[in-house]
Amino acid sequence: MAHLLLAVVAITLALSQSVFGGSPYSNPHFTGSRSVITHLMQWKFDDIAAECERFLGPKGYGGIQLSPVNEHAVLGNRPWYELYQPVGYKIQSRSGNEEQFKGMVQRCNKVGVRIYVDIVMNHMSGAQEGHGNCWFKLQWHHDVSRCSLLVPNDFHGRESCHTDNMDIKNYDNPEEARNCRLSGLRDLKQSSEYVRQKQADFLNHLIDLGVAGSRSDASKHMWPGDLEAIYGKLHNLNTAYFPANSRPFIYHEVIYYGGDGIKSSDYTKLGRAIEFHFYRDIANVVRRHNQLKTVKNFGQPWGMVPSDDALVMVDSHDLQRFHTGQVGVNINYFESRLLKVATAFMLAWPYGVPRVMSSYHWDQKIEDGKDKNDWIGPPSDGSGNILSVTPQPDDTCNKEWICEHRWRQIYNMVHFRNVAGNEAVSHWWDNGDYQIAFGRGSKAFIAINLQDGQGLNRKLATGLPQGTYCDLVTGNLAGGKCTGGTVTVDGSGNADINIAKTAEDPFVAIHVEAKLH
């Protein structure tokens, strides 16, 4: 019997791994049918905990990406990127302290929402004006723990970086990109066993507190072999929240658009790669640079990594500030119509693990293809304390916080994806140009109209059972009634789909859990 039980456990683990790809670090450990991550950029830990309980849990979100949580440089104008200049590995940031972090993780896990921490392992802060730094002669943030116990020999020096000022010049040269400094930030020598252990200790502390995994910032600038050695030291996830022997979920920032040099696939045995082709290619389609009909085989045939190795997005904290990509391609909340369409497609299309951006407001100032205000940090008071997020009666947030994850058109598409599950794309239709529709088996259906100056008015096969469905783009199913439009599916699975040429939200989405009768 014991041998049989062990065999069953082994088969279960093998099946779980096959669903989430070949890497032991590719499983996000969502609960139930949940399937979507949102990035709550630089929210306070207490606000995140409350959001899990009042919105993210009930609306079916699977997890949250946090901004970096460890002690960091404090720069004069409090830019958002100071969190990406760590000075040590104590949980202490603008978002809160360790006790607040611990409480947040517990409260979110309790309602089925996983936590993924943005981890900066490539570097420590540079010797810039400000305070919060360590061996490079600046004080500690909050004057805690006498630095991270790192010394100059724990960083790459001229013996391994040969550029004139030790900064990266050629980002496609693996040795230079991984041994030299990223924008002047002190590059950690992860071939050092001491550095590896320090970083593993920090990750293990987060794991023991109940996080499900992490985003690996700037993975492109770290040797895969060094990361593999560090990950080999990691604990399994906390069994108070996860099944025994669960490995942490890790997804890697590897900016790659094709060609030679450092590839996304170099990192997929260590988790998922953030697929930059995805945002760029869908942005070009939504902007009508390429025909919408071409997305019929969107994913790996477009040069992307396999679906089980991908995390996908249409916006991010870097993209919306044009730190990669460019003005006229990248889509963000300043162009809400385009963002909603791109996000709807991402959530309807069965490729990768999707992540939804949730932003705060800042005043863009575009000059010469750059945002001159791209440094502006989160909403804060005169002392630099981050302002709380306050939900409004209409489910939006106070004006300082954009809260795209609370937009009806987005959270209802999160539900769409959860309902569609592993169903394949079916009932594809297009007009040969900028109108498409497709189903997800017998569970869900979406139609999108980006045709210039032309509505979509057509009877289409949906694959859904006969009945009347709430259109989740224009409203919700509440109290047995639709607050928006409806779509009627006949006995043959067909429905009259109507999307006006001037529609603010040029798509219709229905699924079996929004069926009236």
Curated annotation (Swiss-Prot):
Annotated protein name in UniProt: Alpha-amylase
EC code(s) of this entry: 3.2.1.1
UniProt remark on cofactor binding: Binds 1 Ca(2+) ion per subunit. Binds 1 Cl(-) ion per subunit.
Entry superkingdom: Eukaryota
Activity vs pH: Optimum pH is 6.5. Active in slightly acidic to neutral pH range.
Gene3D superfamilies attached to this UniProt entry: Glycosidases, Golgi alpha-mannosidase II
Keywords: Allergen, Calcium, Carbohydrate metabolism, Chloride, Disulfide bond, Glycosidase, Hydrolase, Metal-binding, Secreted, Signal
Cysteine disulfide partners in this protein: C52-C108, C397-C403, C470-C482
Record's keyword annotation contains Phosphoprotein: no
Location of this chain's protein in the cell: Secreted
Residues annotated as signal peptide: 1-21
Provenance organism: Acarus siro (Flour mite)
Residues annotated for chloride binding in this entry: R215, R355
Entry's Gene Ontology BP terms: carbohydrate metabolic process
Ways its activity is controlled: Activated by chloride ions. Inhibited by acarbose. Not inhibited by wheat alpha-amylase inhibitors 1 (WI-1, the tetrameric form) or 3 (WI-3, the monomeric form) and bean alpha-amylase inhibitor 1 (alphaAI-1).
PANTHER family listed in its UniProt record: ALPHA-AMYLASE
